[in-house]
Design a protein with these regions (language model features):
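Metal-dependent phosphoester-hydrolase catalytic domains
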Residues: 1-12, 121, 138-139, 158, ...
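Surface-exposed cleft-lining segments at the edges of enzyme active sites
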Residues: 31-36, 66-68, 121-125, 151-159
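Active-site beta-strand/loop signature of hydrolases that rely on acidic residues for catalysis
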Residues: 24-29, 48-73, 111, 137, ...
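Beta-strand-turn-beta hairpins that frame and shape the catalytic cleft
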Residues: 13-24, 106-108, 112-117, 130-151, ...
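Solvent-exposed loop/turn segments connecting transmembrane beta-strands
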Residues: 102-103, 127-131, 158-160, 249-252
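N-terminal, active-site-proximal structural segment of metallo-dependent hydrolase catalytic domains
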Residues: 1-88, 100-105, 166, 264
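Catalytic-core segment of enzymes that process non-peptidic bonds
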Residues: 90-124
Length: 264
């Protein structure tokens, strides 16, 4: 098995009733630390994520490994952070390693209650030291042909971000035209140029913008001003999008998570 994808036993989806709704959560984990790296809170984050009962969890800035942190912080997990968060609740997980450094590496991850039958990490790094990727997973959801999930964490630089959004658009154009697609994560798009670059059409929408008329404010977590995190859907409908802005969420990362019910 690919070491950067995981699966624990699951019942055959062919025997399961058709799934029409998926609970989706996206959260920038800030590598398991509070804002400004003041405190290691991965165990508390796991409990909060579990409490949402999400079917699919999109994670950004999650550590695959970090030797120095493992030696320094009591309670550091013996597994990768995404495996620790998945625990026994999400049977399948996939990881896209983006940034690699002497002590370890981090990237995006997807946790799923349904089988991940295929995944790939598309390198969308432009130039310089900043490494970015799009983690594309194909899910085997009962009653559906296939559901595509793309976990996103884009550049801090506007020029890089625009090129990465164009690559995301090309990825979307390569997928089956009628397939349900969920795109979620940290777009770092504080200028709100993403919709124009993606070329939103009737079959592609951003959940918060459709329901509330504007994108969600998610950063910084304690006093959210910037609209950085998004949930886009194609060939699926959104219902009840929420910003998880209360405690404990406001104290578990520098970003606030987003939760959306996706109707297939």
């Amino acid at each position: 098995m690919n070491p950067e994808a995981g699966s624990k036993g699951f019942a055959s989806v062919n025997q399961a009733p058709a799934v029409k709704r998926l609970q989706v959560l996206t959260v920038n984990t800030h590598k398991g630390f509070t804002a400004f790296n003041r405190r290691f809170i991965l165990p508390e984050l796991r409990e909060a994520v579990r409490s949402t009962q999400a079917d699919i969890v999109f994670l950004q800035e999650v550590l695959g490994s970090h030797d120095r942190h493992a030696a320094r912080y009591p309670g550091w997990p013996q597994t990768s952070q995404y495996e620790f968060l998945a625990d026994s609740m999400w049977s399948d997980f996939a990881y896209g390693r983006n940034a690699v450094y002497p002590d370890g590496h981090h990237g995006n991850a997807l946790l799923s209650k349904y089988p991940i039958i295929e995944h790939r990490n598309l390198d969308v790094s432009i130039t310089g030291p900043e490494r970015r990727g799009l983690l594309h997973c194909v899910l085997d959801v009962p009653g559906q042909h296939q559901v595509h999930a793309i976990c996103v964490h884009l550049s801090l630089l506007e020029s890089h971000r625009q090129k990465q959004l164009q690559l995301l658009r090309k990825l979307l154009e390569s997928l089956p035209a009628d397939a349900p697609v969920i795109i979620a994560g940290d777009f770092n798009d504080w200028k709100s140029h993403g919709n124009r670059t993606l070329g939103l059409q009737r079959d592609l929408h951003e959940a918060f913008e459709r329901h509330h008329g504007h994108l969600a404010r998610t950063y910084p977590a304690r006093l959210p001003l910037l609209r950085l995190d998004r949930v886009y859907l194609r060939n699926a409908e959104s219902h009840g999008p929420r910003i998880l802005g209360h405690k404990p969420w406001s104290h578990l990362s520098d970003h606030l998570p987003l939760a959306v019910e996706v109707r297939l």
